[in-house]
Amino acid sequence: MKVVAFNGSPRKDGNTATLLHVALSELESQGIETELVHLKGPISGCIACFKCHEKLDGKCALDKDIINECIEKMAGADGIILGSPTYFSDLTPELKALIDRSGFVGKANGDMFKRKVGAAVVAVRRAGAIHVFDSINHFFLINQMVIPGSSYWNIGMGLAEKDVERDPEGMQTMRVLGQNMGWLMKKLKE
């Protein structure tokens, strides 16, 4: 089994990446292969050209960024984690582009993410995290994915790099998320 996580932060080693590493470590301790992908830009948003509905090749017609590589990784994984910091009470444009473009491609190609396990991870300084968490979970639910819970919402608090490490509840929430995601993936394979 494999989980691929996407870091939607422009900071490769910031708080979002820190939270993702904690969840991925728990999955690895259960023998699950993991991969962390940094959504490096520039990344274009969906232009609603609907070429993915015409070609039906599992790819977005926009091919000058990493989104098609990400879609391929998502299709090949058993679990997907989408992580984002909270910017003005919303997710980053890089993650939004991945959600929109992979969502269109997935729907056009036979619901290619159906029954995969999906988890949202959100870094926040103060407010807006629930909106980001909800937006990511809507993507999972629209794509008929299964969402594991944790001991609280999958949120870590901090501003400066590595600040989330001083949020014990946030770190514990990520550990429990990784444990529950691994358990759920194994149950779905039985």
Question: Where is each model-derived feature located?
Answer:
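N-terminal beta1-alpha1-beta2 submodule of the flavodoxin-like/Rossmannoid cofactor-binding fold
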Residues: 1-108, 158-190
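Short, solvent-exposed aromatic-acidic interface loops
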Residues: 154-156
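Short, glycine-/small-residue-rich phosphate/pyrophosphate-handling segment
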Residues: 93-94, 108-152, 172
